[in-house]
């Protein structure tokens, strides 16, 4: 499937726009704790879920599957959801660019990573405790 150039532009322009606090997770690891407005949540499985919602199950017959996919791509609904799809891929690309090894993870200022939680307060406490021990 070809991704339009405008979608790729949005993807790469927004890939660096996540400084601050970002929770990287998936649908199986819901966010816990209080979430302030300045925290971004990136669900790493969002692109797959959005595509599954858009395309549904395709035929096992390649020609029929191609016809179904072309029909979906030409639909107004696909065009409306294209920006959400590009944004979800941008989040995945940014997680990859940070070198995240696993998720869930809370990332502070694209520099400090706390793995294994989606709770920002708990992650901040772990980070602060670790930083206090550093010389």
Positions of PLM-derived features:
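Extracytoplasmic
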Residues: 36, 100-101
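Conserved segment of the thioredoxin-like fold in thiol-based oxidoreductases
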Residues: 55, 60-83
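A short, hydrophobic beta-strand/beta-hairpin element that forms part of a small beta-sheet core
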Residues: 103-114
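Thioredoxin-like thiol-disulfide oxidoreductase module
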Residues: 77-100
